[in-house]
């Protein structure tokens, strides 16, 4: 495991209980989206991973090492394998792009003759070779975040922490940054933890997700599995799933989930032909995820109880997830 958090508790001096019994694992090569509403404990969680915050109790293991047991110099060395980017970039305004990236190498005591080539390599990676002499005030928000990404990768980390890294960006720039992160993750075989309150970020970037609410992890798993079958009320809210009805008198209303391989199949028309049943479509949409697409249909079955039951058994036999909505 690249990251293991074991039974983490975090209680601040004012008595606020930010994290409660948190257990979390991150495997090599995974991109984990940690999502929740403001105040849920997301930023506290990510700052514990590199010990910018220390837990009240529990264990923090990164690359198999318990960071809480390290001496200051040992912790500083361990942090070199953990990159981090922030919402507001945290660039040094008095230094240009080259110097901002080089600063991380200087702190790590790189030899001067190696710093120049490494900075050029990093700026090429993030597409800013032509901006190395620019200062932060001359850059757009997306360019500033690219500098921050380059700086975070300076010391060849195998873990990248992203704390609301796209929250200050518009949607077009967010997409370009997420595309860059996805490409870099593949190229460098990074493990990534991305804190966000935006479900679109999870959909576009992550293969794993965890939902945090009131200091607890309430749901954790593959992105497509959670989107297909969310369990917790907060997860359903974040994904945007509602109990949809045509009216209060509606009966036999179901939500059907179609995973990628079923999206192009005429399942509903086949069902109508096969059984003595009509199907009224109330709503539908498709979620485009990193790993696969997922389709949702909310429908009402119009037919006898026996034929409706046969239709449901048919859908289940195809491997579709079917949920009856409340009458």
Swiss-Prot record:
Alphabetical UniProt keywords: Amino-acid transport, ATP-binding, Cell inner membrane, Cell membrane, Membrane, Nucleotide-binding, Translocase, Transport
The GO terms this record gives for MF are: ABC-type D-methionine transporter activity; ATP binding; ATP hydrolysis activity
Compartments where located: Cell inner membrane
Domain ABC transporter: residue ranges: 3-239
Q: Which InterPro entries match?
A: AAA+_ATPase, ABC_transporter-like_ATP-bd, ABC_transporter-like_CS, ACT-like_dom_sf, MetN_ABC, MetN_ABC_transporter-like, NIL_domain, P-loop_NTPase
One Pfam family, please name it.
Answer: NIL
Which region is the signal sequence? none
Membrane topology designation: Peripheral membrane protein
Superkingdom: Bacteria
**Catalytic activity reported:** L-methionine(out) + ATP + H2O = L-methionine(in) + ADP + phosphate + H(+); D-methionine(out) + ATP + H2O = D-methionine(in) + ADP + phosphate + H(+)
Instruction: Locate the residues binding ATP.
Output: 36-43
Q: What is its EC number?
A: 7.4.2.11
Cellular component terms (Gene Ontology): plasma membrane
Q: What does this protein do?
A: Part of the ABC transporter complex MetNIQ involved in methionine import. Responsible for energy coupling to the transport system.
Q: Which family does it belong to?
A: Belongs to the ABC transporter superfamily. Methionine importer (TC 3.A.1.24) family.
Q: How does it assemble?
A: The complex is composed of two ATP-binding proteins (MetN), two transmembrane proteins (MetI) and a solute-binding protein (MetQ).
Protein known as: Methionine import ATP-binding protein MetN
Native organism: Helicobacter acinonychis (strain Sheeba)
């Amino acid at each position: 495991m690249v990251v293991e958090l074991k039974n983490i508790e975090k209680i601040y001096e004012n008595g606020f209980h930010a994290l409660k019994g948190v257990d979390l694992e991150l495997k090599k090569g995974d991109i984990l989206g940690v999502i929740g509403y403001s105040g849920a404990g997301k930023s506290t969680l990510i700052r514990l991973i590199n010990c910018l915050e220390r837990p009240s109790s529990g264990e923090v293991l990164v690359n198999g090492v318990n960071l809480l047991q390290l001496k200051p110099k040992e912790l500083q060395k361990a942090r070199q394998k953990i990159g981090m980017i922030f919402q507001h970039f945290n660039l040094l305004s008095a230094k240009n792009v080259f110097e901002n990236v080089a600063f991380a190498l200087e702190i790590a005591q790189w030899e001067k003759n190696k710093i120049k080539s490494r900075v050029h390599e990093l700026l090429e990676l993030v597409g800013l070779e032509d901006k190395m002499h620019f200062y932060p005030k001359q850059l757009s928000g997306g360019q500033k975040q690219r500098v921050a990404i380059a700086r975070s990768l300076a010391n060849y980390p195998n873990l990248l922490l992203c704390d609301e890294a796209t929250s200050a960006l518009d949607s077009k720039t967010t997409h370009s940054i997420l595309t860059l992160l996805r490409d870099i993750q593949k190229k460098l075989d990074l493990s990534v933890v991305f804190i966000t309150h935006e479900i679109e970020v999870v959909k576009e970037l992550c293969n794993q997700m965890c939902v945090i609410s009131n200091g607890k992890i309430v749901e954790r798993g593959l992105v497509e599995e959670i989107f297909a079958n969310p369990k917790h009320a907060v997860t359903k809210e974040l994904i945007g799933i509602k109990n949809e009805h045509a009216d209060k008198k509606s009966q036999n209303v179901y939500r059907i989930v179609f995973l990628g391989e079923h999206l192009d199949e005429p399942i509903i028309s086949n069902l109508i032909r096969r059984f003595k049943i009509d199907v009224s479509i109330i709503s539908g949409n498709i979620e485009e995820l990193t790993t696969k697409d997922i389709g949702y249909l909310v429908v009402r079955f119009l037919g006898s109880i026996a034929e409706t039951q046969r239709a449901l058994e048919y859908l289940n036999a195809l491997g579709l997830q079917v949920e009856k909505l409340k009458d």
